[in-house]
Amino acid sequence: MRILLIFFVPSGILDQLFPRISILSTLRVNLTNSPLLTPNLTLYSMVNGFDFSKMFGRKDPELVSKEVKQYNERRFKQMALFYGFTVATFICSKIAYRGVIKRRYVPNYYQHNHVAPPFSFYRDALSAVFHSTSLAITSLGMASTGVLWYYDISSVAEFSFKLKQALGGHDKEQELKKLPEDETVQEIQNSINSYLGDR
């Protein structure tokens, strides 16, 4: 990302702050008549010289390995899912709010405030089911995608593996593999292997 920057700074300060910036043109300007700016300032006009990726410590995309690119794409997909459900939740909440506001009864002058306005049971029930279902689905999706993004989970297999690892199932499985086998179990296993080997 390269942009054009033209600004006023005191002489020598920009070279100390950003030594990697290539200055294409340096002009001396004596601003003696300006009450806001001090005299003897340097006008730096930089074209194709300021790189934000270097400023923020990002590497050149050509130098990044394939694994890092795949990891970045994976995290970007998780983030996109979370923010997509967040926007959907916000939209559904605004729709539900507008639906509730529309049903509000505001009496005019010389009207009773205890008289129920005309309404339809079918329409109210349908709108209530729609609003509650949309809010429940989008909020659940936002919460689940946020948790999956936090724990870096992108598939069902990864979820089952990390859940098994968190509950201690992986360690128990390794302990069971280290235990010596029973003689009867070993005989049954050998007979099954021999039967399958003959066929």
Curated annotation (Swiss-Prot):
Alphabetical UniProt keywords: Membrane, Transmembrane, Transmembrane helix
Compartments where found: Membrane
InterPro entries: AIM11
Transmembrane region(s): 79-101, 129-151
Membrane protein topology class: Multi-pass membrane protein
PANTHER family: ALTERED INHERITANCE OF MITOCHONDRIA PROTEIN 11
Name of this chain's protein: Altered inheritance of mitochondria protein 11
Gene responsible for this protein: AIM11
